[in-house]
């Protein structure tokens, strides 16, 4: 008998689960209508399934933050709650950028959330001539921002497209100055090099961070959002300079991909959390049927469900077995 509900939550893609210091789990994910952000609170992982869903923010009617509300993540940083998410504009729905919400009180379920606006890139006060001016971050299609702390520094990793015409989606990393502003220029972390990252679209997105046994692992999702969607992985030594691309090693093959025999299609956009008994869990989404049953763009199909996968470790590295 499975330990965790399967699926954990139906109709929720891009799931994110945060376990707070009080032992409670907070769940958020992309809402199928792409028009709101909801959170759930539960004392156990399985409790998330039937937990009350609270709408804490809705899209704007016009202007920015008015369409394609995607991939929210809830974080607790320096005593405050934040949600990072991506959204497009009302008249330019693909002008997607990362935005930040902050909770005004200690209870994210009942206290008010306010908008801090778009994530801010690093800007040198002396202008472009000064070394360190970032004129690239968040200037193009940008989404899937995640954040983590390591050795007293906070970092952000996100996906951003380059070459607007061709649309390659890369992963970038930078140190953060505040919860809504970068401290350093962006550093290219990962680009779609391999065939399995280039099916229909050239994509690296949905980064998730896991620390284990002296290493930092970053999983990410590759290719288009149908059954070709899969997970890749990067790793770095915990003592390395995380802003040096040479510190990172990339797997040449996907660490998780479609398995028709197990009815797993397009696994990806995961996060990591700690299970009820302290085990490492991967929370991810996938469909339970093939793309051939989908009419139109898989992105518009609501049947991506949140699932739980217990992470195993071999030779110090995470292994993802369905």
For the regions a protein language model found, what residue spans apply to each?
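Carbohydrate-active catalytic/glycan-binding domains of CAZyme proteins
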Residues: 1-322
């Amino acid at each position: 008998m499975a330990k965790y509900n399967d699926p954990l939550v139906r109709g929720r893609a891009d799931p994110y689960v945060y376990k707070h210091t009080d032992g409670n789990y907070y769940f958020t994910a992309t809402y199928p209508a792409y028009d709101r952000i909801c959170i759930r609170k539960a004392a156990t992982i399985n409790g998330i399934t039937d937990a009350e869903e609270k709408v804490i923010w809705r899209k704007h009617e016009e202007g920015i933050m008015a369409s394609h509300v995607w991939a929210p993540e809830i974080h607790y940083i320096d005593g405050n709650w934040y949600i990072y998410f991506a959204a497009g504009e009302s008249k330019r729905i693909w002008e997607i950028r990362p935005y930040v919400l902050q909770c005004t009180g200690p209870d994210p379920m009942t206290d008010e959330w306010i908008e801090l606006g778009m994530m801010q890139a690093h800007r040198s006060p002396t202008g472009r001539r000064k070394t360190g001016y970032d004129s690239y971050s968040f200037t193009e299609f940008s989404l899937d921002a995640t954040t983590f702390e390591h050795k007293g520094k906070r970092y952000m990793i996100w996906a951003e497209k380059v070459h607007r015409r061709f649309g390659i989606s890369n992963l970038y990393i930078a140190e953060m100055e505040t919860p809504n502003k970068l401290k350093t220029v962006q550093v290219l972390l990962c680009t779609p090099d391999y065939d399995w990252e280039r099916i229909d679209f050239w994509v690296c997105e949905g980064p998730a961070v896991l620390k284990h046994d002296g290493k930092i692992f970053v999983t990410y999702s590759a290719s288009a959002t149908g059954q070709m969607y899969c997970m890749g992985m990067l790793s770095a030594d915990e003592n390395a300079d995380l802003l040096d691309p040479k510190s990172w090693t990339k797997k040449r093959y996907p660490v998780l991909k479609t398995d028709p025999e197990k009815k797993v299609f397009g696994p990806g956009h995961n996060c990591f959390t700690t299970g009820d008994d302290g085990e490492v869990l991967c929370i991810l989404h996938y469909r339970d049927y093939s793309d051939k049953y989908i009419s139109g763009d898989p992105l518009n199909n609501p049947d991506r469900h949140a699932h739980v996968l217990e992470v195993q470790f071999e030779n110090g590295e995470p292994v993802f077995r369905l």
